[in-house]
């Protein structure tokens, strides 16, 4: 048994200026950059987000710009197995998360719990 839920929407930006990208998206979404958030570092900028909503993060990338989601779980291997049975494929396994690809081609990440209140609004998988 494990739990999982939508954790974050990541806006992948192929840019040399992640601060400018974050400024644009922050203003577009009405959520300023949160400079004190531990996720604001290197090529990442966190936007201010209420604790009961998915995180919005701007990420500097080398691939084409796109949007992807993160699914947070209390058991990454179990969630990867569950999603694999649905047809998703593992693209890359990193130290703290797994990149997967849906049967329809979209990439997404399976990550450890990151938002407060977990497992509120999470689905229990037996």
Model-based region annotation:
Residues 29-38, 85-93:
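Short secondary-structure junctions
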Residues 17-32, 79-85:
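Amphipathic alpha-helical segments
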Residues 1-22, 67-71, 114-126:
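N-terminal beta-strand motif that seeds the catalytic metal site of vicinal oxygen chelate
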Residues 1-3, 25, 38-39, 48-50, ...:
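A generic structural signal for short, solvent-exposed coil/turn residues
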Residues 15, 51, 64, 69-107:
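Vicinal oxygen chelate
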């Amino acid at each position: 048994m494990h739990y999982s839920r939508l954790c974050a929407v990541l806006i992948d930006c192929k840019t040399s200026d992640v601060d400018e990208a974050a400024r644009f998206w922050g203003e577009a979404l009405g959520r300023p950059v949160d400079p004190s958030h531990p996720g604001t570092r290197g090529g990442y900028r966190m936007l201010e987000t209420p604790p009961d909503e998915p995180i919005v993060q701007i990420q500097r990338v080398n691939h084409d710009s796109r949007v992807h989601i993160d699914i947070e779980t209390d058991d990454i291997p179990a969630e990867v197995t569950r999603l694999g049975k649905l047809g998703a494929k593992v693209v890359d396994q990193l130290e703290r998360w797994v990149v997967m690809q849906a049967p329809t081609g979209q990439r997404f990440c399976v990550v450890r719990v990151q938002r407060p209140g977990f497992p509120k609004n999470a689905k229990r998988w037996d």
